[in-house]
Amino acid sequence: CMKAAPMKEVSVRGQGSLVYPGLRTQGNLETLSGPNDATRGLTSLADTFEHVIEELLDEQQVIQPSKENKDADLYSSRVMLSSQVPLEPPLLFLLEEYKNYLDAANMSMRVRRHSDPARRGELSVCDSTSEWVTAAEKKTAVDMSGATVTVLEKVPVPKGQLKQYFYETKCSSKGYAKEGCRGIDKRYWNSQCRTTQSYVRALTMDNKKRVGWRFIRIDTSC
């Protein structure tokens, strides 16, 4: 069950023209990467990537949430404010997915890499696609009270305006979306892949022209 945070102006922090709403960070590149990274001599790009990911996850565990950011877990990594279309999935989204995978696997890094589903030829039950969607494409959404609100395309910031982007995941129009879930015996069971939604925080306007940050529903999984 999700608990709504108080409706207050969300902080925007980041570098350049790419930021996450409500993202709070601690430390800098030196403290996150560690003093001995340059001399460790990792042998491959895969090892380097895994090493950086693990250090970021370790740093995240060290940071203890204070009373001021007790609602930080309600902020979604699927919302981004940017002057242009993001070229990659959100970093926090990748970290969360990777952390969930590590927790589930609970094995050494090298064993995890060789047991990756892609290496074993495993397929998901339902095929899905993910992409960045603009507020102009969404136009409207449903908030936590069930009311339809207008999703604002641009968010004012000290140096101008940034566009709102949403990283949505939905069932693929091809494959097993209509034929049923992969791996289910169709002779005995009926199944269907459906797109499910979650709440993210976005700048919106209600039917009374009141602008504010609200939790709205977007497509997040299949």
Swiss-Prot record:
SS bond partners: C126-C193, C171-C222
Family, per entry: Belongs to the NGF-beta family.
Taxonomic classification: Eukaryota, Metazoa, Chordata, Craniata, Vertebrata
Pfam family membership, one: NGF
UniProt keyword list: Cleavage on pair of basic residues, Disulfide bond, Glycoprotein, Growth factor, Secreted, Signal
Name the record gives this protein: Neurotrophic factor BDNF precursor form
Domain of life of the source: Eukaryota
Biological-process GO terms, alphabetical: cell surface receptor protein tyrosine kinase signaling pathway; modulation of chemical synaptic transmission; negative regulation of neuron apoptotic process; nerve development; nerve growth factor signaling pathway; neuron projection morphogenesis
Endpoints of the signal sequence: 1-4
Propeptide: 5-113
Glycosylation sites: N106
Keyword Transferase among record annotations: no
Organism of provenance: Xenopeltis unicolor
